[in-house]
């Protein structure tokens, strides 16, 4: 293999690696967007659950049962 052929082969590999890095970067960005969206939804659902729990649970004093 001549020096020119080796250089061409290396340039091809670098180009393929750059393409792979760009694709992985895009996928990672999309996944972070999804994680952020899911995190916001989870926080909203948690807050809603706590609100409903407060509305549903009567204020019962914590006392020992009579048989204690």
From Swiss-Prot:
InterPro entries: SlyX
Taxonomic superkingdom: Bacteria
Pfam families attached to this UniProt entry: SlyX
Covalent S-S links between cysteines: none
UniProt similarity note: Belongs to the SlyX family.
HAMAP family tied to this protein: SlyX (MF_00715)
The protein, known as: Protein SlyX homolog
